[in-house]
């Protein structure tokens, strides 16, 4: 089974760059305190790094 990470949105997407909003939607995050589980891949890690100020990651 592939390793997964939990990603939680901690800040609002209102007033953010359009690319950052698109990244949130790409990860499946829709609202504050929404948590999703994603596979720990370089692509997902890159998306999380781009919006690290808006999300919390748990291994």
Curated annotation (Swiss-Prot):
GO cellular component, one term: cytosolic large ribosomal subunit
Gene3D superfamilies in the record: Ribosomal protein L30, ferredoxin-like fold domain
Keywords of the record: Ribonucleoprotein, Ribosomal protein
SUPFAM superfamilies the UniProt entry points to: Ribosomal protein L30p/L7e (SSF55129)
Pfam name, any one: Ribosomal_L30
Domain of life: Bacteria
Gene Ontology annotations of biological process type: translation
Binding partners and assembly: Part of the 50S ribosomal subunit.
Record protein name field: Large ribosomal subunit protein uL30
Organism: Erwinia tasmaniensis (strain DSM 17950 / CFBP 7177 / CIP 109463 / NCPPB 4357 / Et1/99)
Gene: rpmD
């Amino acid at each position: 089974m592939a390793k997964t990470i939990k990603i939680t949105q901690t800040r609002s997407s209102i007033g953010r760059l359009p690319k950052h909003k698109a990244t949130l939607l790409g990860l499946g995050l829709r609202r504050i305190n929404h948590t999703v589980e994603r596979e720990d891949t370089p692509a997902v890690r890159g998306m999380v790094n781009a919006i690290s100020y808006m999300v919390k990651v748990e291994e």
